[in-house]
Regions:
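N-terminal leader/signal peptides at the extreme start of proteins
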Residues: 1-12
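Alpha-helical hydrophobic helix detector
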Residues: 18-34
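Conserved catalytic core of two-component sensor histidine kinases
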Residues: 21, 48, 55
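Conserved beta-strand->loop/alpha-helix structural units within folded catalytic cores of enzymes
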Residues: 29, 51-57
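Aliphatic-rich helix starts adjacent to a transmembrane/signal segment
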Residues: 36-51
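Extracellular/periplasmic head regions of type IV pilus-like filament subunits
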Residues: 56-59, 63-136
Length: 136
């Protein structure tokens, strides 16, 4: 008489593996768009902070050199009041997305959000987000 082996082989069935893959795909479909949105929002926050730093640097330059409203401050003058080694200091008056802040800034006038940056981040940062800075 032939005996069947009673030992059962361990492992996962194809159906079990497919269910796990489907669950992982579902979680990824939910998480990835949220991650990308959060990343863009953090980029917008970084640009906003750079605008604040530029405005403060222009004000500091104007105070130390007795400049009045409307005086045009050059990037090299602003740069002296930024933290040495920072990305903004090392840039050629550009934000992290490559948008140009401009080479000159006017005393007592807030700097503007670069047009290309405003356009690329408009889905996560509407006009109110950029207040009080000028938008295109």
């Amino acid at each position: 008489m032939i005996q069947k082996s009673q030992t059962r082989r361990g492992g996962f069935t194809l159906v079990e593996i497919m269910i796990v893959v489907a669950i992982i795909a579902l979680l990824a479909a939910i998480a990835v768009p949220n991650f990308l949105r959060a990343r863009k929002r953090s980029q917008a926050t970084r640009v906003l902070e750079d605008l604040r730093l530029i405005d403060a640097a222009v004000d500091q330059y104007a105070i130390e050199t007795n400049r009045t409203t409307g005086y045009q401050v050059q990037w090299d003058d602003v740069k002296r009041y930024l933290k040495v080694g920072s990305k903004l200091y090392n840039s050629t008056h550009a934000d992290i997305l490559g948008g140009d802040f401009g080479a000159t800034f006017s005393v007592d006038t807030l700097p503007a959000v670069p047009t290309s940056t405003y356009t690329s981040l408009s889905d996560v940062a509407p006009a109110e987000f950029w207040s009080p800075f000028r938008t295109p």
